[in-house]
Regions:
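Cytosolic-facing regulatory segments adjacent to core modules
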Residues: 36, 72-151, 234
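Hydrophobic/aromatic beta-strand patches that form the interior of the parallel beta-sheet core
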Residues: 47-49, 77-79, 130, 180, ...
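A short beta-strand-to-loop transition that corresponds to the Sensor-1 phosphate-sensing loop
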Residues: 80-83, 181-187, 207, 227
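Conserved Walker B catalytic segment
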Residues: 162-170
Length: 262
């Protein structure tokens, strides 16, 4: 039990930090407009990115991994139950190199050189991949052991089931590390069972039929719940051929109404 008197000092400090906040706290994703909304991925927090299948959730998470690896501020752990470590690495190689990932695409000499250079450039980057098919108690114990050996700064978990959210939130608190989980939903603004355990809820929306110049598809990242920052919409561009996400240059495209989370 905690008395009001004991909690007032901490609550006051949080309020002062919120009012005077300028830079994102915690780990930044490399997407400035998105980071301004969520205010960074904080240790112990659970963030969920939800969308219908095949809209780019995994690609978005891998772009975050790429940005972290290039800046080298933290060591990420990537978990996925639906793809093998080789398949995930193939996608990362596509994102890093910018070489089209289509299987019917013939590599040019320049693209072959880029792939070779990319392999050499990222070979020693600190990234661990877990492709276990089952997220059970044994899996969580292994994650705790891995964290003790490697001190991961961020855990990204793909293909998560809603029933795993309470345990993931508990794990984030135990390890004092942010967890970024990806969930598939059947509808555009689908309800996420177990979302009461989640600190930040994000939906990714993309119209597969809509593309702009140079094959860029507009994407909306909608922050619908945020215990640490703002709610609102961030605009990004997605390039399906290379699986890359990029900020929309014009900041006016990110000026959807934002409101402080209360």
């Amino acid at each position: 039990m905690t008395t009001l008197k004991a909690s007032l000092t901490e609550a006051m400090q949080i309020m002062l930090d919120t009012v005077s906040w300028k830079e994102p706290e915690g780990i930044t994703t490399g997407f400035p407009h998105f980071d301004q909304l969520v205010r960074g991925l904080r240790p112990g927090s659970l963030t969920v990115l939800a969308s219908r299948p095949s809209l780019g959730k995994t690609a978005f998470a891998l772009n975050i991994v790429r940005n972290l690896m290039e800046r080298k501020p933290e060591t990420p752990l990537l978990y996925c139950s639906s793809l093998s470590s080789t398949e995930l690495t193939f996608r990362l190689l596509t994102i890093f190199s910018g070489v089209t990932c289509s299987f019917d695409h013939d590599l040019s000499a320049d693209e072959s050189v880029r792939l070779t250079e990319t392999v050499e450039a990222i070979r020693d980057y600190p990234l661990s991949i877990v492709d276990s098919r089952i997220m059970d108690d044994r899996f969580f114990r292994e994650l705790i052991l891995l964290q003790g050996k490697n001190s991961f700064g961020l855990i990204l978990a793909d293909s998560v089931m809603p029933e795993h959210l309470p345990r993931l939130k508990q794990l984030a608190g135990e390890l004092e590390v942010p967890i970024f989980a990806l969930i598939s939903v059947s509808q555009r603004d689908g309800y996420i069972p177990g979302s009461e355990w989640v600190d930040t809820v994000i939906h990714l929306h993309r119209d597969r039929r809509e593309t702009k110049n140079e094959g860029r598809a507009p994407v909306s990242i909608v922050v619908s719940r945020n215990r640490f920052g703002l709610c609102g919409t961030c605009r990004l561009n997605f390039i399906p051929q290379t699986m890359r996400f990029e900020d929309v240059p014009d900041i006016e495209d990110n000026e959807d109404e934002q409101e402080e989370t209360r």
